[in-house]
Amino acid sequence: MKFLIAIKNTKEESKNILEIGCKIAEGFSADLTICYIGKQSKALIEGDVNLARKTLSEWNIHHPGLEVLEWAFNILKEKGFAPDSDFDVENLVEEKGRIRMVLPKTTNYQIGLVLREGDLLSELNKEVKHGDFDIVIMGSPHRKRMTNKISQFLDTSIFFVKNFNPNWNYKILLCVDDSRATKRAVILSTRISKQFDAEITSLTVSKTSLFGKGYRNAHIWAERYLKRIGIPFNSKLLSGNPVEVFVNEAGEDHIIIMGKAKGNEFLKFIWGSK
């Protein structure tokens, strides 16, 4: 599998996103790319710079995005996800529209760093297509319109991280329905559960008091799978507005995992949750 972590700066929020993203990727032994998309610089547009002849300090003058990549590299080392080596600008490779660094492979998965410049949504979509990623892990945008655009525009699964605190003991809220993506979400939840030693709540919500055959079968399948894997869990069948029920059940101490939501329900859920 291939995971992409998109970071936007060097603040604590991005550090937490890196930490949870690396833990999840490690659980899947997935190749991992950390991508920063910065403002477009004149140097990259003109293509007149030679990476091999530039020192890091010179590059930082023109490409502050490299400071972000170096910061991410140091966080990876601090958390034990990257080798104990220096961030060497000579290991950067300039390609069409992107600059990348592949770190020495010390585990059974590969880690890379990527710098892109320009429009966030457009460049993120290009990177997703370039890497053929299974999932994108990123912070929840502060603007609802951008969240909507990202959810609709990117052709991959997306894990929005909002207000993650690495010091909390999280539980997992697994939202189960009859969508095609549910089984994948259930499998993903077991891997994350093992990484965070987190109990799973399997939740199926119907808008009425009646649960259709598809919902019941999906709920039963999830229970059987979790039992077979040996993950501690509890399951619930609840009636009501799905978004409101999800928000009430999630509280502030759950990692939420679901398949691809219908319409804008997932977006409402993100902005309604803590």
What are these regions (language model features)?
Residues 101-105, 161-168:
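Short boundary motifs at domain starts and secondary-structure transition points
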